[in-house]
Structures are given as C-alpha cells and as structure tokens.
Curated annotation (Swiss-Prot):
<comment type="subunit">
    <text>Homodimer.</text>
</comment>
<dbReference type="GO" id="GO:0009254">
    <property type="term" value="P:peptidoglycan turnover"/>
</dbReference>
<dbReference type="InterPro" id="IPR005486">
    <property type="entry name" value="Glucokinase_regulatory_CS"/>
</dbReference>
<dbReference type="InterPro" id="IPR001347">
    <property type="entry name" value="SIS_dom"/>
</dbReference>
<feature type="domain" description="SIS">
    <location>
        <begin position="59"/>
        <end position="222"/>
    </location>
</feature>
<dbReference type="GO" id="GO:0097173">
    <property type="term" value="P:N-acetylmuramic acid catabolic process"/>
</dbReference>
<comment type="similarity">
    <text>Belongs to the GCKR-like family. MurNAc-6-P etherase subfamily.</text>
</comment>
<dbReference type="GO" id="GO:0016803">
    <property type="term" value="F:ether hydrolase activity"/>
</dbReference>
<dbReference type="InterPro" id="IPR005488">
    <property type="entry name" value="Etherase_MurQ"/>
</dbReference>
<dbReference type="GO" id="GO:0097367">
    <property type="term" value="F:carbohydrate derivative binding"/>
</dbReference>
<dbReference type="InterPro" id="IPR046348">
    <property type="entry name" value="SIS_dom_sf"/>
</dbReference>
<keyword id="KW-0456">Lyase</keyword>
<comment type="pathway">
    <text>Amino-sugar metabolism; N-acetylmuramate degradation.</text>
</comment>
<keyword id="KW-0119">Carbohydrate metabolism</keyword>
<feature type="active site">
    <location>
        <position position="118"/>
    </location>
</feature>
<dbReference type="GO" id="GO:0016835">
    <property type="term" value="F:carbon-oxygen lyase activity"/>
</dbReference>
<feature type="active site" description="Proton donor">
    <location>
        <position position="87"/>
    </location>
</feature>
Length: 307
C-alpha cells in the first residue's frame, strides 16, 4: 500500500502548469481551459480500451452464472458508482440487487461529505462480508488516487472470497501498484484545480462506468440493436419510449403498439417476440427464458424451427 501520509507525487495531486493563473482568467478563458482539458478524458478511455473490454466480457460471464456487480468507492468515486448502479433498473429492468453501489459512509455520504470514513480499510472488508460476496460476483474498486483504504480493503476482501476484482484508478501503476484481476488506469493528468478529482478524474470515471455497465447489459441481451428493449415502463416518458420502440421495429400504429404493450404486461421485449412469432404471452415468455432473455437469439431460433 502506498504511503498515505504523502501523496504529492501522485498524478492526481500534482499542479497543472496550464492552470496556474486560474484565478486570473476571464470566464470565457476558464471555460475554454476546462473544455481543452476535458478532451484528455476521452483519450484516457481510449488508452484503456483493452482493459475495459476485458472487464465487460468477464463481468458479463459472471452475471450470466448468477453473480452480481458491485461498485466500491468513497467521495466522488463512490457517488459515481452508486449513480451508475441506480440507473440499471430503469434502463435495463434489472433487479436492484444485480448492480449495487457501495460508498464509504453509506447513504448519508451521497449528500454530505464523509471523506474521513474512507481511511478505514476494515470498513471496506466489512461491506464485502455484509453482502456475502462469492466467486460469482464482481467487485469494482474506484479510487482516483489509488490509495483509498476503504476501497483497497474491499478489493482485498473480495479477492479472498474468489470474486472477480477490477481496480479503477487515475494514477499510473508505477505510482500506486495494487493487485486485482483487471487493472484499469485512466490517466487524465493533473486537475485544473490541483487535487480536485471530482473534475477530470470524475468525468473519466463516469465515462468508463457508462461503457462498462452498458457493455455488460448488451452482452446479457438487454438490448436489441441500439434499443433498450428491457426498459421499465414506470412513467409516461418511458411508456412513450416503449411505444416508439415498438412502432419503429414493427411498423405498427401507435394505437396498435399500445395494445401490444398492454398484452405483454408492458414488457417491450416480450411484445416484440409476440408480434414477430405470433406466440401468446406465456409461450413468448417461455421462448425468451429458454434463450436467457436474448431477443435476437429467441426469435432466430423460433424462425429456424418453424420455417
């Protein structure tokens, strides 16, 4: 573990030479500087694309076997993990326990700074034990500077339980080395405001989690083409989206699409199976279940057997 008392050598703590006159910039100059620095976040994701792709494949494999995905972090990193986890149920109709966020300090830390709680590795260990992590699960540790004891404690505990571990940090391994199954380094350089990792480090983390969770859900068959066919229809906006998906993919009128959606218990994926195969709700559900919810595979299998 790195020396927690001295972090000045860390990339995320260094002073950015391009922003040394930050307090003297005009508002327009400040925006231009932020815009140019933020371009580095996209470059950092590109540089880590192989590791991110590996994380997608291996995470999807664990979840197919009944595993769960956990994000672990403190401060901004923890909040981003909780945010990404919270978006999965409405977007992909996943149960809330499938993707979970663990933040040092618990729910209260989402709205009130609790950074002092990140220094306890034993709390990270306890968080993993409390959730009964097994070899089927995936634990993603997120720590911009790479040294957060809460995250390191959680990852070490998860490794001991046989879980797939993924480490995400914004410092090079030469500065902070850590043992995990997949090591993702997102190097965006010093922050415009020195040490404020809610900036580029936060942005690049959000980009990466977007790709990771969406990629996993694509691999799990939660998407057809680029449509969220497992969207949870829980309000008027999402009902409208569901109807437009059905209209676009079937050519039905809005009224007919609405009727089909109701017949399928508001499940777009099942509605499409029913429309494309002529099966009733129960038979369509069984067909999807036989193909682990993969719409494309289910429909192709039915057509191959009935041509």
């Amino acid at each position: 573990m790195a020396d927690l008392q001295e972090r000045g050598h860390l990339l995320t703590e260094q002073v950015n030479p391009l922003s040394q006159n930050l307090d003297q910039l005009s508002s327009l100059e400040l925006v231009e500087l932020f815009n140019s620095e933020d371009l580095k976040t996209v470059e950092a994701v590109a540089a880590a694309k192989v590791q991110i792709a590996t994380a997608i494949e291996q995470t999807a494999d664990r979840l197919r076997q009944g595993g769960r995905l956990f994000y672990v972090g403190a401060g901004t990193s923890g909040r981003l993990g909780v945010l990404d986890a919270a978006e999965c149920p409405p977007t992909f109709c996943t149960p809330p326990e499938l993707v979970q966020g663990i933040i040092a300090g618990g729910a209260g830390a989402l709205v009130r700074s609790s950074e002092d709680l990140e220094d306890r590795a034993e709390d990270g260990d306890a968080a993993i034990a409390q959730r009964h992590i097994t070899q089927l699960d995936v634990v993603v540790g997120i720590t911009a500077g790479g040294t957060t004891p809460f995250v390191q404690g959680a990852i070490n505990s998860a490794r001991q339980r046989g879980a797939l571990t993924i480490f995400i940090a914004c410092v090079p391994a030469e500065q902070v080395s850590f043992t995990a199954d997949i090591d993702i380094r997102l190097l965006t350089g010093p922050e415009i405001l020195a040490g404020s990792t809610r900036l580029k480090a936060g942005t690049v983390t959000k980009l990466t989690l977007n790709i990771l969770s969406t990629g996993v859900m694509v691999k799990l068959g939660k998407v057809y083409g680029n449509r969220m066919v497992d969207v949870a229809v829980t309000n008027q906006k999402l009902r409208d989206r569901a109807l437009r998906i059905l209209q676009d993919l079937t050519g039905l009128s809005r009224e007919a699409a609405g009727f089909l959606l109701e017949r399928s218990s508001k499940w777009v994926k099942l509605a499409l199976v029913m429309h494309w195969t002529g099966l009733d709700k129960d038979a369509g559900d069984r067909l999807l279940s036989a193909h682990q919810g993969n719409l494309r595979e289910a429909v192709a299998s039915y057509k191959n057997q009935n041509d």
